[in-house]
């Protein structure tokens, strides 16, 4: 298992549309394990494969306080959305920045688990928001895309400055 490098904006690889996973095999399971290691190391609650430069439809999520409720979504499909909500979202690809993003309050999805078995899931609250956020990554969309151009520019400038400071350290 390994911690992978998380891409940061303005990296254009974050805009790539992920391809469906053709077969859930040992290689995909290794990617899932590495993604969980990376997500936990970065103190995130969700990670899409796109964020670690793997352009396949794979998401890992754990919104639990004790980090013991791993959720794997391979080839996720949105079946239903209901209601309206929003929280200040953050993103491992947009470090130390947060913004209020409109989301559906409840979602119903279909996906494959880490063993390739299909399942459906209904979610609300933080889990529903996280699922929507990570599914956006699979189509090259970031939470800042929901913001005004001015807010997008300010966030990009802050992240670029932060990355410059980190690269000097």
From Swiss-Prot:
Tell me the enzyme class: hydrolase
* Protein name per UniProt: Peptide deformylase
Instruction: Give the cofactor note.
Output: Binds 1 Fe(2+) ion.
**PANTHER family for the chain:** PEPTIDE DEFORMYLASE
Q: Which UniProt keywords apply?
A: Hydrolase, Iron, Metal-binding, Protein biosynthesis
What InterPro entries does the record point to? Peptide_deformylase, Peptide_deformylase_sf
Instruction: State the Gene Ontology BP annotations.
Output: co-translational protein modification; translation
Q: Which residues does Fe cation bind?
A: 91, 133, 137
Catalytic activity as recorded in UniProt: N-terminal N-formyl-L-methionyl-[peptide] + H2O = N-terminal L-methionyl-[peptide] + formate
Purpose: Removes the formyl group from the N-terminal Met of newly synthesized proteins. Requires at least a dipeptide for an efficient rate of reaction. N-terminal L-methionine is a prerequisite for activity but the enzyme has broad specificity at other positions.
Which family is annotated?
A: Belongs to the polypeptide deformylase family.
Cite the SUPFAM superfamilies for this sequence: Peptide deformylase (SSF56420)
Which taxonomic lineage does the organism of this UniProt entry have? Bacteria, Pseudomonadati, Pseudomonadota, Gammaproteobacteria, Enterobacterales
Highest taxon listed in the record's lineage: Bacteria
- What EC number(s) does the entry state? 3.5.1.88
Q: Which cofactor does it need?
A: Fe(2+)
**What positions constitute the catalytic site?**
134
The Swiss-Prot or TrEMBL record annotates one GO molecular function as: metal ion binding
Q: Which Pfam families match?
A: Pep_deformylase
